[in-house]
Structures are given as structure tokens and as C-alpha cells.
């Protein structure tokens, strides 16, 4: 993973070539989490007798979870990260889960009526947790 100016992130393969490029703006320290999650994958084996058996293997996969502001125009006149930390700037976020091994992006945004300004992101194999700065409540998003 390489970070670039202007909110760009590049996934780089073992050969040094860029495999996927993302562009989004967020406050990485407050709104992102690098995680490793266990992902199930099935393998099939053929026995000497000709029967096929399958086995589920759970591999560790590197994941980036970020709360991404839906509108960043308010960032233009802000002093970052100070205005954000002092709550002079609030955001309304979507939540993205990016599999860093293949670049697959899953939108995990909560379906709630009130705004979500997500901080303190944590994750388990089953769920993503965060605090909403608008109401100081803990939220849980199930991972499917």
C-alpha cells in the first residue's frame, strides 16, 4: 500500500506495479483501521479412490476500514485535524471495507436516518464498531 497526495491510495503488487488505485479523502488517524480478518475459502481434494472432499480454510486477509466523509467541501476552509478534533468540523460518513489483497471494496455504511460521524473504529470477524460523534453512541455493523 502506498499513500499519495490528494487522498489517493495505491495497491502495489510484488512486482512493484500498481494493481489498484483508490481516491478518497478522510482523516486517516481518526477514521481508519488497518485490520486482518479471517476469510473462508473452500478447497477440494481428490483422494486415491476417486472421491472428492472439500475443506474450508480460513486465511488472514489484510483489510482497511475507513469512515469516508460524503462531502469534503467543508474541509477547504478548515484547519485539519484541529477543527475536526475540537468538533468545529463534523462530517457525515459512509463506511468502506477494502480487501487489500485483491482491492475489493464493500460499502458497510449504516442505514440510519441521523447523520453518522464515525470515529474509534474497531473490528471483529463478525462486525465493525464505531462511535458516532453526533450522539456519542456505539454502533455495530455486521460483516457479511
Residue ranges with predicted function:
Residues 18-36, 100-124:
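Conserved blade-ending motifs and adjacent loop-strand segments that build the rim/top face
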Residues 3-6, 70-74, 135-138:
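Short glycine/acidic-enriched loop and turn motifs that connect beta-strands
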Residues 9-16, 85-102:
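Beta-propeller blade signature
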Residues 1-32, 36-45:
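Acidic, serine/threonine- and glycine-rich low-complexity intrinsically disordered segments
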Residues 58-60, 67-90:
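Short, conserved, GDST-rich strand-edge loop motifs in beta-rich repeat architectures
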Amino acid at each position: 500500500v502506498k499513500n499519495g497526495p490528494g487522498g489517493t491510495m495505491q495497491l502495489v503488487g510484488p512486482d512493484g506495479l500498481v494493481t489498484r488505485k483508490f481516491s478518497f479523502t478522510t482523516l486517516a488517524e481518526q477514521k481508519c483501521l488497518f485490520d486482518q480478518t479471517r476469510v473462508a475459502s473452500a478447497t477440494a481434494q481428490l483422494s486415491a479412490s476417486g472421491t472428492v472432499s472439500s475443506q474450508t480454510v480460513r486465511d488472514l486477509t489484510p483489510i482497511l476500514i475507513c469512515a469516508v466523509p460524503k462531502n469534503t467541501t467543508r474541509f477547504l476552509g478548515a484547519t485539519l485535524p484541529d477543527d475536526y478534533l475540537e468538533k468545529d468540523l463534523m462530517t457525515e460518513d459512509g463506511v468502506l471495507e477494502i480487501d487489500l489483497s485483491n482491492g475489493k471494496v464493500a460499502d458497510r455504511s449504516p442505514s440510519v436516518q441521523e447523520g453518522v460521524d464515525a470515529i474509534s473504529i474497531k473490528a471483529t470477524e463478525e462486525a465493525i464498531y464505531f462511535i458516532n460523534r453526533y450522539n456519542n453512541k456505539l454502533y455495530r455493523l455486521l460483516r457479511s
